[in-house]
Amino acid sequence: MSHQTKENVLFISGIDTNVGKTVATGMIAKALAKAGKKVITQKMIQTGCEHVSEDIEAHRQIQGIPFTDEDTRGLTCPYIFTYPCSPHMAAAKDGRRIDLDTITQSTRRLRETYEYVLLEGAGGLMVPNDMESCLLYTSPSPRDRTRSR
């Protein structure tokens, strides 16, 4: 059964790092699940860790559930970088590039399975994604997912 609508992706953001986005995302997911909704959380880009998104791990702990199949396949966090800084700098330090289509496709696949996707941003709304755009992700649509700086 497909649940794909523009309205089923909720973007969780804050004004900076360490302002409570991760806890808020986990708590909202837990409340939606308790209300009988099929929900998953997603972190577009995680910096400062290796192999596993620490924020996705925190979401699952708050929700009281184990890692999902989507977590192990990387759909819930398409980009993990080791250096703890803004996504564009962390990608450069790791010698990698952030492809916005990869993030969009991951979100689209989650939308097809879940009633709600809670999409946690990295840092604040205007955190640079690369040298030309930021990840102001206002819609799952590829047309309007970025905003030029």
PLM feature segments, named:
Residues 1-10:
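Extreme N-terminal, non-catalytic leader segments
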Residues 18, 45, 122-123:
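Anionic group-transfer/hydrolysis microenvironments
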Residues 137-149:
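Single conserved hydrophobic/aromatic residue that forms the stacking wall/gate
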Residues 26-95:
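N-terminal phosphate/diphosphate-binding loop that engages ATP/GTP or pyrophosphate donors
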Residues 87-128:
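Phosphate-binding/switch loop-helix module in NTP-utilizing enzymes
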Residues 21:
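Conserved lysine of the Walker
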Residues 130-136:
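Charged helix-capping and loop-helix junction motifs
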Residues 13-14:
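Residues at the beta-strand->loop junction immediately N-terminal to the Walker
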